[in-house]
């Protein structure tokens, strides 16, 4: 899979992942924002920008880093529509190796970057490098357990992290884990809500 796949996927007027902030991003980051009315954040592999734009609506500078030009174009458009274009930045880069225009940031978010463990480790390593000491990293993924017990998400175990695999990755990073747990993500379908197992990581940069 390369950027052309994602460009084709995002090549629609609709926002395929909606324009509403992910509920786990909101739940875990709202208390952090409350302690710091102005800040900077990176949304790694942020797609169409729903999470980054939400941060900018709270008065934060946000940077959406993604490798799909189509997604980033929609992210910038959404920022304009929401009146936060002056607070939102977008640039194309690979998640495993990027340079941020806002570094060092206060919060680094990575939501649903479903890639093999080594690629995920490289992406988190780069993200952590761009977060200031005392800042936070929030990760949200379809969990490995979702393959057997949940609805939606990838059907490939290799791109589904677990609490154990994320613990292993974090052991090599300058972070302190504050939350690492499976949550019920729940997927809205035409037949109602379906159970979906989501793994959430909140860590403080040392």
Please annotate each region the language model reported.
Residues 1-36, 38-47, 145:
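Conserved class I S-adenosyl-L-methionine
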Residues 68-70:
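Conserved SAM/SAH-binding beta-strand->alpha-helix loop
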Residues 75-76:
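Conserved SAM-binding loop
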Residues 83-95:
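Conserved SAM-binding strand-loop segment of SAM-dependent methyltransferases
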Residues 106-120:
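A short SAM/SAH-binding and catalytic strip from SAM-dependent methyltransferases
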Residues 121-133:
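A short glycine-rich, Lys/Arg-flanked "PGG" loop and its adjoining helix->strand segment in the class I
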Residues 134-142:
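Conserved beta-strand signature within the Rossmann-like core of class I S-adenosyl-L-methionine
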